[in-house]
Amino acid sequence: MEKIKLIILLFSLTVFSQSDSPITDDFKSIEKIADSLFKNKNFMEATNYYEKLVKAMPNDFDYSFKYAGSYGLYVESLPRLQQVKHIRQMIKRFETAFNLKKDDIEINRALLEIYLRVPRFFGGGNKKAKMILDNIYSVSLEEGKKSELFYNSF
């Protein structure tokens, strides 16, 4: 009886110790599929795959940023009246990625543009854009100057 317990214990340990690798491989496979869909401009399908990754790993900046970007491009491809339904959700996704890595220039530039283009009523506005501009300056003086030119052109 002790031998059976030992065998079961060893078997379960080997099964659980190997479980990390397939999960990581699954994430990489899902990411490759999503990236491929994104490159082919199938933004809604890519968003669905990125969403799975974000739900599994909510603190991963890359997945959150790709999720926000693909959703944003999907929303941008919609007719104006349909865009209205999705704007707040799009902004929320970008803000989630921003909160994970505030010093990333790409997410800062994306949010700056979104806040400048989207009316305050929908979650945008100059006040939020100015906050992002200040954050960009704190990360990089050169990028801050470029972003300020963009900010002033709006």
Regions of interest found by a model, annotated:
Residues A68, L73-Q82, E113-G123, S153-F154:
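Short coil/turn linking the two alpha-helices of tandem helical-hairpin repeats
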Residues L53, T96-A97, N135-I136:
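Canonical positions in the second alpha-helix
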Residues V15-Y50, V54-A56, F61-K66:
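N-terminal leader/linker segments that initiate helical-solenoid repeat arrays
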Residues T24, P58, K102-D103, S140-L141:
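Short coil turns that delineate tetratricopeptide repeat
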Residues Y63, I107, K145-K146:
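TPR alpha-solenoid repeat register
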Residues I4-T14:
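Sec-dependent N-terminal signal peptides
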